[in-house]
Regions:
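Solvent-exposed soluble domains appended to multi-pass membrane proteins
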Residues: 1-4, 8-174
Length: 174
């Protein structure tokens, strides 16, 4: 599972004409492998709540308006999750995020969600950066590939990207 921060398929934007498909690789992978769309609980912030809902199947709304289960319950105790379920079926589970491990308490939370390992940016090779300073997703993809190469098990890999995070240009395309 790869969660792409702030991603939108540019082909869905009406009233623009593109010279070529900017997401042809993604569409090819989506056609070849299991993929789908998901409705997320947040807009303009709170990526961790989307992560929480995907991994646990629980709504973040159950934990109060404006709350972050990662910073409250999930940082304090084990929470039933996809990682625990798949562990019982013999899977190894790895979570990765190309941002700081302490942000949203991910360094603790992923252990409480049943992941065997969590790899934050601090444990990755030095990444290229976006113009606004976020780590590019190439470092995340490299780490995912390293995990896949190094294991013979069935794996649950949950990668959370940050490359698409704001700020965003405020000028308009003519």
């Amino acid at each position: 599972i790869v969660q792409l921060e702030s991603f939108i398929n540019p082909n869905w934007i009406t009233d623009i004409k593109l010279n070529k498909n900017p997401v042809s690789n993604l569409e090819s992978l989506s056609n070849e492998f299991t993929s789908g769309l998901i409705s997320v609980p947040v807009l303009g912030g709170g990526t961790a709540n989307t992560e929480f809902e995907v991994i646990t199947g629980m709504s973040a709304e159950f934990f109060g308006s404006g709350g972050f289960p990662y910073n409250t319950i999930a940082s304090k105790k084990a929470i039933p999750s996809l990682a625990y379920t798949l562990r019982d079926l013999g899977y190894s589970s790895n979570s990765l995020h190309n941002h700081e491990g302490k942000f949203y308490s991910r360094d603790v939370v992923y252990q409480n969600l049943g992941f065997d390992s969590f790899t934050p940016i601090e444990c990755m090779s030095t990444p290229e950066r976006t113009p606004v300073g976020w780590a590019k997703d190439s470092v995340l993809i490299d780490e995912i590939c390293n995990i896949l190469i190094s294991t013979d098990n069935s794996d649950l890999i949950f990668g959370i990207s940050i490359q698409g995070h704001g700020g965003y240009p405020s000028d308009y395309i003519e």
